[in-house]
C-alpha cells in the first residue's frame, strides 16, 4: 500500500479560520485569514474557496463568526445562503447551524463545536466514499475526471478524486485524464496540483478532447463529483459534466458520481428544479488577467449543468453505492418512504 500525503484546505487557529486561496494555485500557496462575516461572504462568492462540501464547512464557520460579531442570526443565515445558489451542502450546513442557535441560543461554544463536527464528518465521509468507490476501479485503469473534487473541495481527501486517491493508495495502476475545466480551470490548476503532490500519473486535457479519447479507447472509467443530487437521481455538477455523461453513454464507459449524502436534496424531485448559477461573463472573456476574447463580445457563463439519472452508472456515497439511481432506489437507500 502506498503512503499518500493529505492536504487540508482549511485550518482553525486561535478562533480564526485560515483557508487556502484557490485562485492563487498552482503557482502560489497562499493562506487567507477569515475574521468577519464579510470575509466569509467574499471567500465563497469570489471562489477563494470552492467545492460543494468545502463551501458548506466554510459557511458553518461563517455562521459562527457572524454570531460572534453580534449580527442577527437570520441576517447571518440569509447573507451566507446568497453567496452561491447551486451547491446544497451550503444550505444543509447553515440549516444545522441555525438549528443549534434556535435550540440553545447564543452559545458560541456549541456553535463552534457544530461547525467542527460538520468538518470532521465530511472528512470521514470522503474516506468512506474512497473505500466504496475504489472497488469499482479496475486494477489497471485510465480514469477521466472533471473539475476539482479532491482535498481542496472538501475537508480533505476528496470525493471523486478521493476515489482515485484511494485506488492509487491501494497500489492500482492508474492514469488520470484531467479536464482543464473552463473557465476557472479547476482541473488544470487544482486537480493537477493535487495529483502532482501525490505522484499520481496524469495528463491535463482540453475539455473538448474528452470524446476523442473515449473513441480511441483511452478512457476506462469516468468519475465526477456533485453539487446537488435530486430525488430522482439527477445531478447538478460543474458545467461540462452533462456532455461527458452523454459521451460516456455513447461509448459504454461507466460514469460514476461521488458525493456525500449532504449533497442529496430531498426537497427537489428532479434536476429541472435546481437553480443554476450564472457568473460574470468576464470570467469567460479573460483568463487569469489575460484577455482571450474581444471585450465587446458577450459570453454565457453557466457554472453548472444537470446530468440526468439515466446517464449515471452509480452514485457513490459514504453509506454505499446506488446503482442506476432513481427515486425509489434513493428513498429506499436512505430509509425514507415514497410520498
Swiss-Prot record:
InterPro entries: IF-2B-related, IF-M1Pi, IF_2B-like_C, Initiation_fac_2B_a/b/d, M1Pi_N, NagB/RpiA_transferase-like. GO terms for molecular function: S-methyl-5-thioribose-1-phosphate isomerase activity. It catalyses: 5-(methylsulfanyl)-alpha-D-ribose 1-phosphate = 5-(methylsulfanyl)-D-ribulose 1-phosphate. It holds the Pfam family IF-2B. It comes from the Bacteria. Its EC number is 5.3.1.23. Substrate binds at residues 50-52, 84, 186, 237-238. Belongs to the eIF-2B alpha/beta/delta subunits family. MtnA subfamily. This is Methylthioribose-1-phosphate isomerase. It comes from Sulfurihydrogenibium sp. (strain YO3AOP1).
